[in-house]
Amino acid sequence: MLNSHNTNHNNNSASNSNYNKGHKMHLKSATAKATIMKHKLSKFYGYGWMQVFLLLTVLVIGNQSAWQENIRPKLYVELGPEDVLKFVGNESVVDHFKLVTKDGNSLLIGARNTVFNLSIHDLVEQQRLVWTSPEDDTKMCLVKGKDEEACQNYIRIMVVPSPGRLFVCGTNSFRPMCNTYIISDSNYTLEATKNGQAVCPYDPRHNSTSVLADNELYSGTVADFSGSDPIIYREPLQTEQYDSLSLNAPNFVSSFTQGDFVYFFFRETAVEFINCGKAIYSRVARVCKWDKGGPHRFRNRWTSFLKSRLNCSIPGDYPFYFNEIQSASNLVEGQYGSMSSKLIYGVFNTPSNSIPGSAVCAFALQDIADTFEGQFKEQTGINSNWLPVNNAKVPDPRPGSCHNDSRALPDPTLNFIKTHSLMDENVPAFFSQPILVRTSTIYRFTQIAVDAQIKTPGGKTYDVIFVGTDHGKIIKSVNAESADSADKVTSVVIEEIDVLTKSEPIRNLEIVRTMQYDQPKDGSYDDGKLIIVTDSQVVAIQLHRCHNDKITSCSECVALQDPYCAWDKIAGKCRSHGAPRWLEENYFYQNVATGQHAACPSGKINSKDANAGEQKGFRNDMDLLDSRRQSKDQEIIDNIDKNFEDIINAQYTVETLVMAVLAGSIFSLLVGFFTGYFCGRRCHKDEDDNLPYPDTEYEYFEQRQNVNSFPSSCRIQQEPKLLPQVEEVTYAEPVLLPQPPPPNKMHSPKNTLRKPPMHQMHQGPNSETLFQFQPDGYNTQQSYRGRDNFGTLRSHQVMGDNYRRGDGFSTTRSVKKAVNNTNTRNRSLGRARRQPPRHGIVTQHRSNSPQQQQQQSQQPHSSSGSSPVMSNSSSSPAPPSSSPSPQESPKNCSYIYRD
């Protein structure tokens, strides 16, 4: 392929060289131009389309081998009002709900000027804490140019440091403040107030995060009004201010604490990519809990801050990256195959100007720790690449580690950590690839919540993933291979749930469970709820829909591959997680890995409302179920049958799309070619296309191909086959004005008049040739307007005599030549010049007014203003000039001048 590419490159160079030569010939010949255009078109049609075809073929092959197709959900669920618990809050204004904190059997929801205390059971409001901005702060916010909506107090930090106490921070009209309240049965009592700078953001649109560890609050936010000073803060320590090596325009996502470290997840502009452009990378950073700062100038700076890139990509020779992290789950600890690991799940998106795509990736805490123990990355010069640092250059003790007293660290370690906070290696995805990939122009992933290690009959455990989108949908999925392998992924999308009555982005997802379970009437247990938070409402739904009475068979229940659901062979119905004897495999049938069970008969269920049964292969012969939205309050399940195949047929594969593009391109090419060909055959060219200067405003009245090629005996070539006895040719003869041009028109582009040749300056006053131009006698105002020697204005031809005739202005006169075809051509040219013309009559016709004619008759003839060969009042031929002119009319040739 390399040799072939070089060959094509050389051929292209030779073609370009030929084209350059032809381009020079284009100035001389129109035929050369046509040849070049044919050469270029033949080159394009010859192998240009072949290159396009090969490119599309490679894209198709690459798509088949690398890209993961969108996985269809088993169920499309549309919930009714009785299936959803909803809290709206203030209906007059948008509350901008965002934070959710669990406090026993209560939910604390942070919103606009308010903290709502809701019951987990039914989302009924129990208490309300109202905290508005002081009037002075609101006025100052408005003076600084913010609108009234932004000059409110949006709750952005909310933690429970101890039972009965609540720590809350709000934007407070772009002047952050933090309050500590004591919670009682009836109200909230203010205990303390402090400045919220570097803890809470100024702008409610800024993303921030916080976590409480060992009664110390760690926050990631911005520390100034403009939002240009990002910071990771724990009083009194902070990251370097205005240092792009530490934080470069970050958007914080989440944070958690584990062991001796606190971890932050965010996305930022990649400083290591700055020499190649701008890109956003996902990061994980950590600081040590025991960090006390350094000595002297490092006393208020972190001495343990490190960060690394999170690699969520589709593997291959050229990985496809999902670079922008949007949300992260809590730390999940579980069994994955033979490994016991602690995982963090995150949702990642492509950039907004890229292919719309989202993915879910998991990262092991051990892999993150190993990355922070690896090599550092550095840039030695401003134009240098970012390269790993040799381990021999790393000082001892190692920067970024936890020390008993960081204030005793030596200067080499402190200086190194200040300029080398970025690690060289990326944190790999735990399963070596994304768990779920979705490409859609309709929605992207925004939030994630994970219900960890759900046990199934037989003892296997699975993490159930709930993903929120910016279109108000919930996607429930599971990795069917996670219980048996730590490096394989079999994605199963169990449900796509349409929860909201109107589409709006999901801001937060939380899985909550009550302290005690209440046993419902059907014998199953209420094992939790999914809390969905948007700007205008808080919604709670069940984690599963196993008890739906539309699931009537064992094969339907098992085919869901839902870890929450299993078929109760004694009761003969689908039961949910938490039912009695749930872990006993002898009482329940379930197979999350394949969706099939040997004890469940397969077959098509011909139910009118819900069809389920006949299984079709999809990823290890898994059963796919579809749904049909039948009502507002029920979920309908459809098996893959004729309806599903109709949906499949309505979608197009990549191969079909490529073939359609190729067929359409070829068809368009053929239609364009034949249309141009037939139009060229039927349509005649305009006369202006044959002019020597078609892009100017000059043109010939009439021109013959042989007007400049004439024999020695006559000016005009006779063509007996085409002409009658007398041949007449009419052409435009410009008029020369003798006076100098005005100063303001000396450099005019239309000032193209030229002086007559020097050898004609001594001719007689009545002589005139084709190259000697004389002014019109009736032009009394002596108006000046430069004209080209070769034609007249198109506007003059179109408008006729009305073109600037109000001031007696005229530019040209028409000359008509008549040739008698009966005379012999054998007479010598010298004799023809000595004798006056016998058969030709030279006349001059002018359309002057009577006053102008009288003035002209009284003026004496001069060399500069003499009339042509004959005057207006005389019809006799003029005497010949003393010296014959090369352009003088020969024998048998005559001129007829016309205006």
From Swiss-Prot:
Kindly indicate whether the keyword Transmembrane helix belongs to this entry: yes
GO:BP terms for this protein? axon guidance; axon midline choice point recognition; dendrite morphogenesis; motor neuron axon guidance; negative chemotaxis; negative regulation of cell size; photoreceptor cell axon guidance; positive regulation of cell migration
Q: Is Isomerase set as a keyword in this record? A: no
Disulfide partners:
141-151, 169-178, 288-402, 312-361
Bilayer-spanning residue ranges: 41-61, 658-678
Q: What is its main location?
A: membrane
User: What does gene deletion cause?
Assistant: RNAi-mediated knockdown in the neurons of adult males, significantly reduces survival to 30 percent. Adult survival begins to decrease from approximately day 9 post eclosion. Pan-neuronal or glutamatergic neuron-specific RNAi-mediated knockdown decreases adult climbing behavior. Glutamatergic neuron-specific RNAi-mediated knockdown also decreases activity throughout the day (during both light and dark cycles) and results in a significant loss of motor neurons in each thoracic cluster (T1, T2, T3).
Coiled-coil features, chain-numbered ranges: none
Residue numbers on the Cytoplasmic membrane side: 1-40, 679-899
Protein origin, superkingdom: Eukaryota
- What residue spans carry the region label Disordered? 1-24, 735-766, 798-899
Similarity field? Belongs to the semaphorin family.
Functional summary from the UniProt entry: Involved in growth cone guidance through its role in axonal repulsion. Function in neurons is essential for adult survival, motor neuron survival, and is important for climbing behavior and activity.
Name assigned to this protein: Semaphorin-1A
Q: What organism is recorded for this protein?
A: Drosophila melanogaster
